[in-house]
UniProtKB/Swiss-Prot annotation:
Cofactor remark: Binds 1 Fe(2+) ion per subunit.
PROSITE patterns in the record: GLYCOPROTEASE
Protein location: Cytoplasm
Function description: Required for the formation of a threonylcarbamoyl group on adenosine at position 37 (t(6)A37) in tRNAs that read codons beginning with adenine. Is involved in the transfer of the threonylcarbamoyl moiety of threonylcarbamoyl-AMP (TC-AMP) to the N6 group of A37, together with TsaE and TsaB. TsaD likely plays a direct catalytic role in this reaction.
Protein name: tRNA N6-adenosine threonylcarbamoyltransferase
Organism ancestry: Bacteria, Pseudomonadati, Campylobacterota, Epsilonproteobacteria, Campylobacterales
InterPro entries: ATPase_NBD, Gcp-like_dom, KAE1/TsaD, Peptidase_M22_CS, TsaD
Underlying gene: tsaD
Any one cellular-component term (Gene Ontology): cytoplasm
Family annotation (HAMAP family): TsaD
Gene source species: Campylobacter jejuni subsp. jejuni serotype O:23/36 (strain 81-176)
GO BP, one annotated term: tRNA threonylcarbamoyladenosine modification
Cofactor: Fe(2+)
EC number of the protein: 2.3.1.234
Length: 335
């Protein structure tokens, strides 16, 4: 029975393939190969290196799931947004597979995929507020009853996750910065350093992390010798201020929209400090908090496969001749 969808994710520095049963939503296969160690020496993702590593990793993963090929009904792939050369690696493989197996091709928006990480084994729920925090994006969305997405707030500059990476790089801590900063902050012995919460007195429903990032840079310059204790203290102050900023604007949004359900997605949503604060906020406003499983917060192909199930039902197919590469976020107004 041809009821399986194979999905490919390669938008940044994770090579991933998943296979899902479109009828039961059962995950039949999922594998991810991370490039974090390869990019860590550079303090961030190097696009050309990422593309080369994708071209090596994706075929290796594909060989591990070829037993399912006979039951495939479609091929899905992340086509936007992301690094052009990384996206192209996955798209090229997807088109080759779709052509060779004579299957329909389904392009999936990466951010929609993150939203579906909340509903990997269940039907998607509408009328829900969503905080998306990742290395490339910070936004608050409202998924309405009619499946339209309303953007309530976004960042004017750096994203939440990106700011963690950049602060980690300033202190020569490595990449990715999210986990490094979070773990370092837990070891802070002193807590005398503080930073101002960005846009604290602004009515604008927006985020901005560039000023906070610069404040951290200036704090680092004050210290001739950046000891481990000082690094931990800076990490603690930065993480808490970044989370304060997220929560400050979220509280204003909650007051306006009175969410009954609220979800949190994206790689940076794995931050335990942020998760704890979100739980408190939802309790305060009697909202049900829905969290993506920690394993599937970061980029993965299973969320792309899950999004593809609904896209398959709507017959959102494209020709393999069509240019579907879209590094910018163009198709993100409706689920």
């Amino acid at each position: 029975m041809k009821n399986l969808i194979l999905a490919i994710e390669s938008s940044c520095d994770d090579s991933s393939i998943a296979i899902i049963d479109k009828n039961t939503l059962e995950c039949k296969f999922h594998k991810k190969i991370s490039q974090e160690l390869d990019h860590s020496i550079y303090g961030g993702v190097v696009p050309e290196l990422a593309a080369r590593l994708h071209s090596e990793a994706l075929p290796k993963i594909l060989k591990q799931c070829n037993e399912h090929f006979k039951n495939l009904c479609a091929i899905a792939v992340t086509n936007e947004p992301g690094l052009s050369v990384s996206l192209l690696s996955g798209i090229s493989m997807a088109k080759t597979l779709a052509s060779a197996l004579n299957l329909p091709l389904i392009p999936i928006n990466h951010l929609k995929g993150h939203i579906y990480s909340l509903f990997l084994e269940e039907k998607i729920s509408l009328d829900i507020g969503i905080l998306l925090v990742s290395g490339g994006h910070t936004m608050v969305l409202y998924l309405k009853d009619d499946a339209n997405l309303e953007l309530l707030a976004s960042t004017n500059d750096d994203s939440f996750g990106e700011s963690f990476d950049k602060v980690a790089k300033m202190m020569n801590l490595g990449y990715p910065g999210g986990v490094i900063i979070e773990n370092l902050a837990k070891n802070a012995k002193l807590k005398n350093i503080s930073f101002n919460i960005p846009l604290k007195h602004s009515k604008e429903l927006a985020y901005s992390f560039s000023g906070l990032k610069n404040a951290v840079r200036l704090e680092i310059l004050k210290h001739e010798n950046l000891s481990d204790d000082i690094k931990a203290e800076i990490a603690y102050a930065f993480e808490n201020t970044a989370c304060d900023h997220i929560m400050d604007k979220l509280e204003k949004i909650f007051n306006l929209y009175k969410f009954k359900n609220f979800g949190v997605v994206g790689g940076a949503s794995a931050n335990l400090n942020l998760r704890s604060r979100l739980q408190n906020l939802c309790q305060k406003y009697n909202a049900n908090l829905k969290l993506a499983p920690l394993k599937f917060c970061s980029d993965n192909a299973l969320m792309i496969a899950r999004a593809a199930v609904d896209a398959y039902e709507k017959k959102e197919f494209v020709s393999i001749e069509e240019d579907i590469l879209s590094p910018k976020n163009k198709n993100f107004s409706r689920i």
